[in-house]
Amino acid sequence: MPALRKHPQTATKHLFVTGGVVSSLGKGLTASSLGQLLTARGLQVTMQKLDPYLNVDPGTMNPFQHGEVFVTEDGAETDLDVGHYERFLDRNLSGSANVTTGQVYSTVIAKERRGEYLGDTVQVIPHITDEIKRRILAMDAADSDGNRPDVIITEIGGTVGDIESLPFLEAARQVRHEVGRENCFFLHCSLVPYMAPSGELKTKPTQHSVAALRSIGITPDALILRCDRDVPEPLKNKIALMCDVDIDGVISTPDAPSIYDIPKVLHREELDAYVVRRLNLPFRDVDWTQWNDLLRRVHEPRDTVRIALVGKYIDLSDAYLSVAEALRAGGFAQHAKVEMRWVASDDCETDASAAAALADVDGVLIPGGFGIRGIEGKIGAIHYARKRGLPVLGLCLGLQCIVIEAARSVGLTEANSAEFDPATPDPVISTMADQRDAVAGEADLGGTMRLGAYPAVLEPNSLVAQAYGTIEVSERHRHRYEVNNTYRDRIAESGLRFSGTSPDGHLVEFVEYPPEVHPFLVGTQAHPELKSRPTRPHPLFAAFVGASLDYKNAERLPVEMPEIPEHEPNGAEHALEDAPARG
C-alpha cells in the first residue's frame, strides 16, 4: 500500500474569514477581535484583506462609496479594515496586508507580457489563483524583528456567491490543500435575521450561505451568527446539524455596546479556545490586563466632551473612520467620552452659519480631503474658532486651511491653495515639485502622492513638542500640496508659528498659535490618526481632547482672543506673485 502524502511541515496556521447573505456583517471587526484574542494569548498574529474589486488600490475611489483610505507605514493605500487590524493587534502592517483583484491581474498580465508563462494560455485557474496564493503565503515572512507569525488571519472581502470573490475563495481552498487541513481554519460570518411579525429568528439564510460555500469545496470550521440578539441554544444546535459544523464552532454574536467589547463577546462564546484547539496552537490564558483597562475607560468615563468634525464627506462616517477612532482614543487617555458632532463644512462659510453649527461644541477638528467643495466652510470654522479661543486640530487639508485663514487675516485677502484656485495671486499652498505632472494630468493619479511615514523635527517648547514629549517624530502622509515657503514670513505676522518641519527645514509639517494668542490651534500636514491605537492613544489627539475639556470646564465662556491686526490690501502683498515657489 503506497504511503500517504504528507503535507509540508509548517509552524504557521492560516485562518480565513468569509461572509455570506449580506455585506457589512462586521467581518473585519470579527477578524480583528479574534486576532486581538490570539495576540493576548501570546501568539504572533498578522492579518490580510483580500478585496475583489478591480481597482489596484482604493486611493482613487470615491470616499462616499468606499470610506477612508488607510495608509500604511510603507506608503500603501489600503482598505479601511487594515486600520481595524492595526488598532486591534497594536502593530504596524505593510502594503502586503491588502490585496486587490486589480493588483493580481496587473501582476499576471505583466508576467505574460514578459513571456514568463512560456506560451501558456493564461487563465483564472491556475494563473490568477496562483498569484493570489503567492500573496497569501508571502505573509508567512519574518517581520523586522525576525519573528514569523504563528497565525495569519485572511479576510476575504465580498459575499459568498459573488462572481468577483470566486478566484479568492478557490485560492483559499488550494492553500488549505497545500498546507494541510490541520493547519487551516475557515470562519464564516452569516446573518440570522429576526422577523418581528412572527417573533422568530430565521436560520435558512445561513444554511443557504454555507451550502454555497460548500459547493466550491470549502466547509467552514466555525460560524459567526450575526444578530441583534443572542441566538438560543436550540437554534445553534439546528444550525450545527444542518451546516455540518461542530456545536462548539457555532458562535452567537449579538450587537455589542462598542466595538471594543467584541473580543469579550467572542471569548465568552469560547471561539478563541476552539480555534487554538482545532489548530493545535500553544494554549495560554488570555491576558486581559490592557484590554480591561481600555474597557473601563470606554464604559466609565469621568467626563464628556463634544467635538465638531467639520468635513466634506460626513454622509458616510466611514470616510473618517480612523479620525473618529483616534478622537475616541484621545478621550480614553483623558478618561472622557467624546461625543462627535458631524458638521458639513458647507454649513460654516459665514460667521453666522459657523456660530449656529459650532455654538455648543468644545473643540473643532478639520480632517483631510480633496477638491474645492466645502473649503470656504472649513476656513470659516477655523476663523470662528480662532476668534473665540475654541480648540482646533487640523489634519492634512486642515493644516492648509489654517494657513489660508492666517494669510487672509494679515491682508492677503485672495490667499488660497493652488489646488482650489490655480489663478490665485497668493498661492500660500502650492503644488509639491514632484507632484506637478500628476496635477497637470500628465502622470497617473493613483499611488503617486507623498505617501507613508516621513520624519519631522519639532520646535522645542512648542505645543506639539510638549504633546509628543520629543522633538523628533514620524507620521504618515497622503498629500500633493505643501505650504509655500515664499509666504512664511508674511503668514507669521498673524502669530502662526511653523512649529515642525521636515529634517531639512523645507516642508512645513506642523503649525500652531502660541498659547498667548490661542490656547490650542494646531495643524499637521500628516495623518496622525493612522497611528492611534485604542490602548495607546495618539499624543496629538490626547492633547486636543485635553484642551477641549479645559475649554468646557471654563463653562464655555466665549473669551475674545487677542485681535490680530487686519491689514488692508494695498497691492504690496502681491509683489511675490511672480516669485518661484520653493515648494
Swiss-Prot record:
Residues where L-glutamine binds: 369, 397-400, 419, 480
Where is Mg(2+) annotated to bind?
Answer: 81, 155
Keyword presence, Ligase: yes
Question: Which SUPFAM superfamilies does the record match to this protein?
Answer: Class I glutamine amidotransferase-like, P-loop containing nucleoside triphosphate hydrolases
- Region of interest (Disordered), residue spans: 561-583
Q: Which InterPro entries match?
A: Class_I_gatase-like, CTP_synthase, CTP_synthase_N, GATASE, GATase1_CTP_Synthase, P-loop_NTPase
Where do the catalytic residues lie? 396, 527, 529
The cellular component terms of Gene Ontology attached to this UniProt record, alphabetical and capped at eight, are:
cytosol
An example Gene Ontology molecular-function term: ATP binding
- Residue positions annotated to bind ATP are 24-29, 81
Residue numbers binding CTP? 23, 162-164, 202-207, 238
Q: Domain of life, per the record?
A: Bacteria
In the Enzyme Commission scheme, what number(s) does this protein have? 6.3.4.2
- Which residues of the sequence carry a binding annotation for UTP? 23, 202-207, 238
* Catalytic activity from the UniProt record: UTP + L-glutamine + ATP + H2O = CTP + L-glutamate + ADP + phosphate + 2 H(+); L-glutamine + H2O = L-glutamate + NH4(+); UTP + NH4(+) + ATP = CTP + ADP + phosphate + 2 H(+)
Which stretches make up the Glutamine amidotransferase type-1 domain? 306-554
Q: Recount the known activity regulation.
A: Allosterically activated by GTP, when glutamine is the substrate; GTP has no effect on the reaction when ammonia is the substrate. The allosteric effector GTP functions by stabilizing the protein conformation that binds the tetrahedral intermediate(s) formed during glutamine hydrolysis. Inhibited by the product CTP, via allosteric rather than competitive inhibition.
GO-annotated biological processes: 'de novo' CTP biosynthetic process; pyrimidine nucleobase biosynthetic process
Amidoligase domain: annotated span? 1-281
Q: Can you state the subunit structure given in the record?
A: Homotetramer.
Further comment found in the protein's record: CTPSs have evolved a hybrid strategy for distinguishing between UTP and CTP. The overlapping regions of the product feedback inhibitory and substrate sites recognize a common feature in both compounds, the triphosphate moiety. To differentiate isosteric substrate and product pyrimidine rings, an additional pocket far from the expected kinase/ligase catalytic site, specifically recognizes the cytosine and ribose portions of the product inhibitor.
The record's similarity note reads:
Belongs to the CTP synthase family.
Which NCBIfam families does this one have? PRK05380.1 (NF003792), PyrG (TIGR00337)
Descriptive protein name: CTP synthase
Species of provenance: Mycolicibacterium vanbaalenii (strain DSM 7251 / JCM 13017 / BCRC 16820 / KCTC 9966 / NRRL B-24157 / PYR-1) (Mycobacterium vanbaalenii)
Cite the source lineage. Answer: Bacteria, Bacillati, Actinomycetota, Actinomycetes, Mycobacteriales
